[in-house]
Amino acid sequence: MRLTILFLLSLLSAARLSAGQSWTPPSESQRCPSRWGAGDERGSANLMTRDQVLKAAKLIRVGEVIELGQVLGANMPFFGTRRFDVHVKRTFMNDFSNRRGSNEELVVSEIGQVGTQFDGFAHQTHENSWYNCFKVAENATRSGFTKLGVHNVGALITRGVLIDVAGFKGVETLGDNYEITVEDLEGALKKQNVTLQPGDAILINTGWGKLWAKDNARYVKSCPGIGVKAAEWLIGKDPMLLGSDNWPVEVAPNPDKLISLPVHQIALVVNGVHLLENLKLDELAAKGVSEFALIVQPLKIEGGTGSTVAPVAVR
């Protein structure tokens, strides 16, 4: 039976290669160790130096804070079986003369992968291997992963750049399965008169966020976003973060039906670049804001794969 399964897997692999699979994850010898050393767990977060923070601070000129996080609630779109339920409770009314009462809430949710979210490196693998070739099987416990937990990331402050691809294409929302090209990115940046720099947080406006809590079924079924070529081009600019106003940052489903969410592997596994998903970018786009100081901090979930976040753009 085992030999039969292996034979079938080999046939499947050969069929994929003969069909011209558009992207294949590089071998461990090609991608490891990472540029920051064999034991590194921070990846692109290493780009947040004091100089990078000071450079971001210089972009704050009018003191305006723009929220980039969606509201967490039961009516937001969910991928798969994820959920977010809030149950409020009256906990007590004390017996002191001022009769102070208290209320709390119980949240039932997958806190790392709902709403506006930050993808840590433990979130995605190539087979059994994470970023920097740490192994899932060697670092998995019931209460969290012992390597690459999102608690390692800390606060990130850097120059944020909005690439308004929807605006460049002259539409409110890109098509349901539109793959953003390198030419789209270059054209939008030229129109906005912006040049990408190492350490940037690159946020891509597709307009897909307009469907949030309005057409959830369509929102999660597919989405426009970057593909393999655009992702590799962006990562070549040495960003700290890649983000978008859709659920996976990338186009989904991928036009190549043989592969699933390859940009997740390209960013998180191969290159150690964190992703920001489900961002609220409509206000930035409407105001024509291309550069700003981005501030984001994942929750310190020990051994977690990611975190819901509420990033802000300050200008």
Q: Where do the protein language model's features map onto the residues?
A:
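Active-/binding-site microenvironments in catalytic and ligand-binding cores
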Residues: A19-R315
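Bacterial N-terminal signal peptides
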Residues: I5-A15
